[in-house]
Amino acid sequence: MPAETAPRVILASGSPRRRELLGNLGVPFEVVVSGEAEDSQETDPARLALELGQLKARAVAAQHPDAVVIAADTVVALGGTLLAKPADEAENAAFLRQQSGKTQQVYTGVCVISPAGEQSGVERTDVTFRALTEAEVTFYARSGEGLDKAGGYGIQGVGMALIERVEGDYSNIVGFPLALVLRLLRGAGVSAFGV
């Protein structure tokens, strides 16, 4: 699709990881952060991720109705308990202790809104942590790497060493499941990979 006819794409996220992954698809885009409060009474992690992704996309689409807006939200659940972004080093360490030797679920809700309508979906990936020593927990929590990430770890960094197994889409754990993103963008008429 020639650049002059390509739809304007807006990523409704301030996440550097989402910016990098969308950029890797060869999709020209701009960033507009929604600023919406991520408040919900929803307790089901898949529905919560979808609801928050839709909330962000709808807020930005209301300001830019001519654009294709994409937003996502990632939720981590362990045994039915939601693990948000840790507030500090102590909470990060507590999250890691909870996850040690266990399998968590990572859900990302993605919503694409274009002048033609709204499409959305949820991706789930299971992540199994190794049995962590207290020294590993302390070291990682002190690193600060997990402070801005749901579940308190960054799989694309040193946090990968905490993980024993991943079942599902790796990019989902980073917060932007590329296969789902690509399908939704194509459904809105957006080409990827420069074609």
From Swiss-Prot:
Tagged with keyword Hydrolase: yes
Stored InterPro entries: ITPase-like_fam, Maf-like
Active-site feature positions: 73 (proton acceptor)
GO biological process: nucleotide metabolic process
Cofactor(s) the record lists: a divalent metal cation
Record's catalysed reaction(s): dTTP + H2O = dTMP + diphosphate + H(+); UTP + H2O = UMP + diphosphate + H(+)
GO MF terms held by the record: dTTP diphosphatase activity; nucleoside triphosphate diphosphatase activity; UTP diphosphatase activity
GO terms for cellular component: cytoplasm
The keyword Translocase is assigned to this record: no
EC number(s) recorded for this UniProt protein: 3.6.1.9
A Pfam short name: Maf
Site (Important for substrate specificity): 17, 74, 156
Keywords: Cytoplasm, Hydrolase, Nucleotide metabolism
Localization per record: Cytoplasm
Annotated family: Belongs to the Maf family. YhdE subfamily.
Role noted for this protein: Nucleoside triphosphate pyrophosphatase that hydrolyzes dTTP and UTP. May have a dual role in cell division arrest and in preventing the incorporation of modified nucleotides into cellular nucleic acids.
UniProt name for this protein: dTTP/UTP pyrophosphatase
Native organism: Deinococcus radiodurans (strain ATCC 13939 / DSM 20539 / JCM 16871 / CCUG 27074 / LMG 4051 / NBRC 15346 / NCIMB 9279 / VKM B-1422 / R1)
